[in-house]
Amino acid sequence: NARHFRERMSSAGFDLRPGNHPIVPVMLYDAKLAQRFASELLEEGVYVIGFFYPVVPQGQARIRTQISAAHSIAQIDRAVDAFIRVGKRLGVI
């Protein structure tokens, strides 16, 4: 599931931290953007957390996602589609 999420998000143009684990950081680098992105995703029905300083170093703000084996491919695709809509709206992709 995490691989599917990573592949779709990368193909859409998102900057992801490398790794092979269920926690997938989506890098946005700006704290206010991360907060707004998380808020707009919630409006889309997708709950994520924006991490920014002091939780992560300044300039390294991100959206923290955690993909589970319990998520269906349809749920993951729905989340990615929401990321894409918000990402385009906010000029991230």
Predicted regions and their residues:
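Conserved PLP-binding catalytic core of the aspartate aminotransferase-like
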Residues: 2-45, 55, 59-60, 67-69
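PLP-dependent enzyme catalytic core of the Aspartate aminotransferase-like
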Residues: 43-47, 54-93
